[in-house]
Amino acid sequence: MTHSVVELIEIESAIIQVKMQDRTHKNAFSQELTDDLIQAFEYIRQNPKYKAVILTGYDNYFASGGTQEGLLRIQQGLTKFTDDNLYSLALDCEIPVIAAMQGHGIGGGFVMGLFADIVILSRESVYTANFMKYGFTPGMGATFIVPKKLGFSLAQEILLNAGSYRGADLEKRGVPFKVLPRAEVLDYAVELAQELAEKPRNSLVTLKDHLVAPLRDQLPRVIEQELMMHEKTFHHEEVKSRIKGLYGN
């Protein structure tokens, strides 16, 4: 099943792969990719035969965060990152989601992957929460999920400094994720999904509900706080010029 920029691949009867492939925007969150992702997870929600989801990108890209146009619209006060609830698609999905981040994860794209239940990184790929590079504070739940998944000290560095890290660098820093050569990421994700699919669906759903309940409970308050910080930090001329001058560099 293929939407224009998201392909749904049924690997086995109980395992579905959500492949993001907006090559025009290098998997940045274009309106097309956003809409197709939301539709893909709605399709999964309506199909109770599935027990595991593998979320992945194409070639060297996992997901690249906001488009330049999208960031400028937020800067101008026309939209908010909450208008399209991409960040919690994996968290809200009933069944386990594996983020097979075979390619670069940039900004909100990296954050979206971290909301998955299981995360796999690629040694060669670059991962960054680069919000502060443009001069605005992080959104999409980054200030919540990055510390939760990577640990507070590393998260502070990643969020404040907005630096770029190869998967191999993060492996040396002790991230709790499997870090593999890019060519092996998807195969490993499929192996994990097959192991998940051996379990009863009801038990998978029940346990995920229990494990992520604190995250689901706390996230809305954090999103409110991030929006308040955006009101303080986003609507400045310096941010506008940074988005125009630094985007894609």
Swiss-Prot record:
It is an enzyme of class 4 (lyase). Changing K232A: Does not affect the enzymatic activity. Pfam families: ECH_1 (PF00378). SUPFAM superfamilies: ClpP/crotonase (SSF52096). InterPro entries: ClpP/crotonase-like_dom_sf, Enoyl-CoA_hyd/isom_CS, Enoyl-CoA_hydra/iso. It comes from the Bacteria. Pathway: Antibiotic biosynthesis; bacillaene biosynthesis. GO terms for biological process: antibiotic biosynthetic process; fatty acid beta-oxidation. Its EC number is 4.-.-.-. Keywords: Antibiotic biosynthesis, Cytoplasm, Lyase. Coiled coil: none annotated. It is found in: Cytoplasm. The active site is at H230. GO terms for molecular function: lyase activity. Belongs to the enoyl-CoA hydratase/isomerase family. Involved in some intermediate steps for the synthesis of the antibiotic polyketide bacillaene which is involved in secondary metabolism. Catalyzes the decarboxylation of the 3-methylglutaconyl group tethered to PksL to a 3-methylcrotonyl moiety. Homotrimer. Does not form a heterotrimeric complex with PksH. This is Bacillaene synthase decarboxylase PksI. It comes from Bacillus subtilis (strain 168).
